A protein has these predicted regions:
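Membrane-interfacial terminal anchoring regions of lipid-handling membrane enzymes
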Residues: 1-210
Length: 210
C-alpha cells in the first residue's frame, strides 16, 4: 500500500544520495573501489524481481508475500558486501600468493586496454581454469593493480564460516550452495542478483570447473 510506496521512495532517495557520494569518492580513490550499494533494496524494488515472484506464486500456489519473506534472508546469504578496506586486504593476500611464483605480473598493454574498455561498456564475466589457487587470484590482482572495477567471484557455501567467510564476503565473494535444484526461491534470488550485478557493470570471475 501507501506505506510500501513511501518506503520505496525513501530507499530510492537514499540510494541516489549514496551513489553521488560513491561517484565522488571513486574520482578521488580510483575505480577499483567501485562497490555495489543497496543491493537487497534494489532487488526488492525491481519490477523484474517482483514479476518473477508473482510468476513463481502462480506456479507453486504459494502467496507472493510468503515468497517475499522467504527471499529476504536468502538475499543476506548470497549478496557479497565488498568494502575498500577488505579489497585492500584481499590485494595483499593475492600478492602474497604470487610471492612463491612470480612476484610481478607480465601484462600485455594492448590487451589490458581492451579489457578496460570491455569492462566499462559491457556486462562481463571473466572465466579461468582453476588448477591452483593462484589462478583465482590472478584476475582479482590484475583488476586491482590496474584500477579496474573489482571482480565478484564465486565460492562454495561450505567456505562461508567464521573469519574466512566474512573476509571473502567483504572482498567480493558470492557464496552459493552446492545444490539447490529444488529451491526455487533461492534460484530466483541468485539469478536476479547476478543479473543485477551485470546490469550495473559489476564484472564477475568464475572458474570453468566451478
Amino acid at each position: 500500500g501507501q506505506d510500501v510506496m513511501a518506503e520505496d521512495r525513501a530507499t530510492v532517495t537514499e540510494a541516489l544520495r549514496e551513489l553521488a557520494l560513491d561517484v565522488a569518492e571513486r574520482g578521488i580513490r580510483g575505480t577499483r573501489y567501485k562497490v555495489p550499494r543497496f543491493v537487497a533494496d534494489g532487488l526488492r524494488t525491481s519490477p523484474k524481481f517482483r514479476a518473477a515472484l508473482a510468476e513463481l506464486s502462480e506456479t507453486t500456489g504459494r502467496p507472493v508475500a510468503e515468497l517475499f519473506r522467504e527471499a529476504r534472508p536468502l538475499m543476506k546469504e548470497v549478496i557479497a558486501r565488498p568494502s575498500a578496506l577488505f579489497l585492500d586486504l584481499r590485494a595483499r593476500l593475492d600478492r602474497m600468493m604470487f610471492g612463491g611464483y612470480a612476484p610481478e605480473m607480465e601484462v600485455d598493454a594492448a590487451e589490458l586496454a581492451r579489457l578496460r574498455s570491455i569492462l566499462r561498456e559491457h556486462p562481463t564475466a571473466i572465466l579461468f581454469t582453476h588448477k591452483t589457487y593462484i589462478d583465482g587470484a590472478t584476475p582479482s590482482r590484475l583488476t586491482y593493480e590496474n584500477d579496474m572495477p573489482m571482480l565478484h567471484s564465486f565460492g562454495g557455501a561450505n567456505l562461508d564460516f567464521a573469519v574466512m567467510g566474512e573476509f571473502f564476503r567483504r572482498s567480493g565473494m558470492i557464496f552459493i550452495r552446492r545444490s539447490f535444484q529444488d529451491q526455487p526461491v533461492y534460484k530466483l534470488v541468485l539469478r536476479h542478483y547476478i543479473a543485477w550485478l551485470l546490469a550495473k557493470r559489476f564484472p564477475l570471475s568464475w572458474a570453468f570447473e566451478g
